[in-house]
Amino acid sequence: MIKLLLKFGEKQFMERVRDGHLYFTNALRLRGIEKELLIKGQGDQYEGKTIITGHRLTLGDGSVHNGVFNVIFSLEPANKLPVFCLYTCFEKDCRQDSSGNWVPQLSDDVKDMVSEHFPKADAVAIISNPEQFIQDVLVEFGDGCKHGLVKYAPTSDNVGFLNDMLHAENAGHVGSVYFSLFRKDTFFTKEQEYRFVLSDKEIEEAQEISIELFNGCNIIVKGLDEFFDDMKGEL
């Protein structure tokens, strides 16, 4: 069960999240962050893609070649769907304080991941009522908003990718290509992502989209050093 949701980033942007201004990106941008800025973690050059391995390749001229061939497969309509990502705190990632409230208690491995994958992050937005936050997002965007936990599997798991594609199509979802944005390579497992994907919208570049946060949605922003210091001595 999800206890908390966290967003790591620069303080000025985390304060915007606190006020309901969510920074959505897209698959093209996430690929570029790794390929151009060389930040693997925040970025992923295989975002929304899978690698299909074949042993027989037929070219357009009809010629046939035998061997081992890796083909990178992606769904172009998913490239510009808006994506908003969060870190998920389960019970194993938390503790209860003296008032019975859940507070983050991340492992050293996860702390290291945050520092390595999000090198510009100096703050964290802590969402203490995930259910209310999720509901607020759904109220704003309606049925076109797909949300849930990311599935982690090898990028080469094309069978799983294709099965998910068939499931999404059979379910009759609007913009069923969104499913490809809920799969990531096992390298990213520690990110424990919860994602919102707007399957009926497109954005050319990352942009802020505002929602109304209702009274039950409490978001606190802390400096990252303070956030990590609060966990010391509490294990």
What residue ranges belong to the model's regions?
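NAD-dependent ADP-ribosyltransferases
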Residues: M1-L235
